[in-house]
Amino acid sequence: MKNYTPKEIVEELDKYIVGQKEAKKSVAVALRNRYRRNLLPDDFKEEVTPKNIIMVGPTGVGKTEIARRIAKLVEAPFVKVEATKFTEVGYVGRDVDSMVRDLVEAAVRMVKEEKLKKVTEKAKKIAEDRLIDYIIGKRKKQTKNPFEVLFNYPSAEKSEETEEESMQYKREEIRQKLRNGELDNYVVEIEVTDTSTPMLEMYTNLGSEEMNINLQDIFADILPKKKKIKKVPVYEAKRILESEEAQNLIDMDEVIEEAIKRAENDGIIFIDEIDKIASSGYTAGPDVSREGVQRDILPIIEGCTVMTKYGPVKTDHILFIAAGAFNVAKVSDLIPELQGRFPVRVNLKPLTKEDFIRILKEPKNALTKQYQELLRTEGIEVKYTDEAIEAIAEVAYLINQQSEDIGARRLHTVMEKLFEELSFNAPELGGQQIVITEEYVKEQLKDSLNKYEVSKYIL
């Protein structure tokens, strides 16, 4: 886990997310506390648990993006789950343990990618030697003639040495051509490990995905690995062999051990739509998808051990970030025990016109910049006037006010409509510079302020 100060985390988040200072500060402090915990003595470290966060705010204001960005920033295993996908134990649907299994899978992928990067250069060298063998063909080593041994005949020895030198020269010549890309389109026959395994499915009331025992993995380990011959171009063979050799160089037991440790100590689980499992008002009979799910989630957030195919995983120090609009139910409608597991509560504000202007201008991945880059591939240079940016922001803001407020996601709809004609005609406009002005925006979006036409812009 990377070491960032809270201010540095907020500064990084500011590059992609506009406003919401309170939410950014909360997650920054939560991450810094994890770093502080790692510096504590082992006996005290176990006593410090993460301060889980619940974000309250309308859709499209940055709840999910904040969680995703911080996970990427500190290189922590991250998984996003929808609370509405889970049902109480015993009913059809995903059980809550699956969120921990998903987190471990994400951690394994992350650690494996890191290990593969470290062995890339070594794998390339081994793969190159293998590829040269396939191109020139493997030469069988000749057995020595017994008469040569008895009577010390030198001719065959010299012939073999000369042939060896010639072969070495040929290999170096091919190696140079490979590196220069001269043989890329040459078709070569290679032998690779067959990674496909027979499909085995077992149907239970939990569904095959929820089974703790992965039968395919078990049989893949028991059955001998088969080889298969493939005819592919050299550039493709290079990629296949490099990947296979890199896989052979990493120790999967070490990967799994590190992944479990990272998931337990650095993992972040983002539970979206948590307000949808809050019971509002009086409900008669069993509430399968609401209170039951809350009670099932409770032990995981509180800290328990979940069995995964990689081994047992403790959830005591996983950071949970929950989010919801809470426009129907309230946070207080969650069961008290669950509320107590989220000590940090943050309210995110709805976006204003000024926020929309900043969203279009400031982030590194702003939509305006995305459309500029997309059209640059066609040879078109797009520029915006300040008045045009303000007009786009105003249209998005007013549509949100007149219809369903979907936050910053509304900008996707407006920008797509704005660039519809330009994107369609782009291949014929190569080499031109297009300036998006206020008049152009008003012309393309002239119906957007008419409340009878607003439905066109609703996602």
UniProtKB/Swiss-Prot annotation:
Where does this one sit in the cell?
Answer: Cytoplasm
The protein's matches in SMART domains, at most eight in alphabetical order, are given as:
AAA, ClpB_D2-small
Give UniProt keywords alphabetically: ATP-binding, Chaperone, Cytoplasm, Nucleotide-binding, Stress response
Top-rank taxon, per record: Bacteria
One Pfam family recorded for the sequence: AAA_2
Q: Please list every transmembrane segment annotated in the UniProt record, as residue ranges.
A: none
Residues that bind ATP, according to the entry?
18, 60-65, 272, 337, 409
Q: What GO molecular function annotation could you give as one example from this UniProt entry?
A: proteasome-activating activity
**Any one GO biological process:** protein unfolding
InterPro entries, alphabetized: AAA+_ATPase, ATP-dep_Clp_protease_ClpX, ATPase_AAA_core, Clp_ATPase_C, HslU, P-loop_NTPase
CC terms in the record's Gene Ontology section: HslUV protease complex
Q: What is its main location?
A: cytoplasm
Q: Which family does it belong to?
A: Belongs to the ClpX chaperone family. HslU subfamily.
Subunit notes for this chain? A double ring-shaped homohexamer of HslV is capped on each side by a ring-shaped HslU homohexamer. The assembly of the HslU/HslV complex is dependent on binding of ATP.
Q: Which NCBIfam families match?
A: hslU, PRK05201.1
The protein's role, per its UniProt record: ATPase subunit of a proteasome-like degradation complex; this subunit has chaperone activity. The binding of ATP and its subsequent hydrolysis by HslU are essential for unfolding of protein substrates subsequently hydrolyzed by HslV. HslU recognizes the N-terminal part of its protein substrates and unfolds these before they are guided to HslV for hydrolysis.
What is the protein named? ATP-dependent protease ATPase subunit HslU
Q: Which organism is it from?
A: Thermoanaerobacter pseudethanolicus (strain ATCC 33223 / 39E)
What's the gene?
Answer: hslU
